[in-house]
Amino acid sequence: MSESLSYCLDQIKESADSIATLYFKPPGIFQNALVHNSKTSYAEIITRLIRDADPVDEMSLYMTDKGGKLRRKDGKQGVYDHLTERAATLKRARLLGAPEETPIVHVPKEFYLKQHDIITKKKQRQNRDFLFDEFSKESGGMFEVLIKKFAGDQQVRNLLLALQNGSVITGEDASSRRKTMFVEDFSVELILRLLREIVTQWPLNEHRTKYEHLLQTYHDISDATNKLRAQIADQEHRLQSQDALSEEPDADDDDVAHPTSGVSYLIQQELDEIDALERELEQLRRDSRT
């Protein structure tokens, strides 16, 4: 009984020491899989696992130059090389007594140009619905064909550039400022004209069906809009006629016309109807944009 109690007390003391010193015994799977030699320290094993590289392969990638600095054998330089060179330059200038530069990291211009090209390519939109490929000599995409087709039509060319890049910068407007146009800024007629050329050059049934559906929808909305405009014009004409009939000159009020209550009611009714038609017209315009 006393031996078992002593054993339990020893285990408790060992656990307390482990918690106090933050030392925990590695699990058995780690011991069996990685520690093959009792003389090998855990620090070496963990360092090798974190680096995850073969020392022989590392040495084959780097070399030491005349100044004792590590360089890649393929000649490529990164941010570390640039910072190391800058630190050496600052140290040399400090020894010569030259004024120190401001603590700003000067990134080479080539790095910014490369990043700009990558970002520009990512921003290029590819409309796979109508098989728009990237503009390149190898692909021979539709953009190249369409731009050559509409070489003399600047509006269509601007629309193609907006489809490819998301937006296009046009010439100066009335305020002498350069104008940025997006795809939704172009007229519906111009977009349908471009789609008609696409389904003509590449006559696929799927694309033609979509184009005909869009064209029919546009005609329906256009007809409904024209009818509403005609109704609004008719209502305004009737309203003006009622205003002319309701004007009765009064000598006491310097010929100021005062419409009767019945005429005022009709006028208000016509105005309410015009407002309702204008709201319906605005709703049709929003539907056509979507």
Curated annotation (Swiss-Prot):
Similarity comment: family membership: Belongs to the DASH complex SPC34 family.
Subunit structure: Component of the DASH complex consisting of ASK1, DAD1, DAD2, DAD3, DAD4, DAM1, DUO1, HSK3, SPC19 and SPC34, with a stoichiometry of one copy of each subunit per complex. Multiple DASH complexes oligomerize to form a ring that encircles spindle microtubules and organizes the rod-like NDC80 complexes of the outer kinetochore. DASH complex oligomerization strengthens microtubule attachments. On cytoplasmic microtubules, DASH complexes appear to form patches instead of rings.
Coiled-coil spans in chain: 220-290
Protein name, per record: DASH complex subunit SPC34
InterPro entries given in the database record: Spc34
GO MF assignments: microtubule plus-end binding
Disordered: region residues: 238-262
Record organism: Eremothecium gossypii (strain ATCC 10895 / CBS 109.51 / FGSC 9923 / NRRL Y-1056)
Subcellular compartments: Nucleus; Cytoplasm, Cytoskeleton, Spindle; Chromosome, Centromere, Kinetochore
One Pfam family from the record: DASH_Spc34
Biased composition, class Acidic residues, residue ranges: 245-255
Cysteine-cysteine disulfides: none
An example Gene Ontology biological process: protein transport along microtubule to mitotic spindle pole body
Organism lineage: Eukaryota, Fungi, Dikarya, Ascomycota, Saccharomycotina
Function summary: Component of the DASH complex that connects microtubules with kinetochores and couples microtubule depolymerisation to chromosome movement; it is involved in retrieving kinetochores to the spindle poles before their re-orientation on the spindle in early mitosis and allows microtubule depolymerization to pull chromosomes apart and resist detachment during anaphase.
Main localization of the protein described in the UniProt heading: nucleus
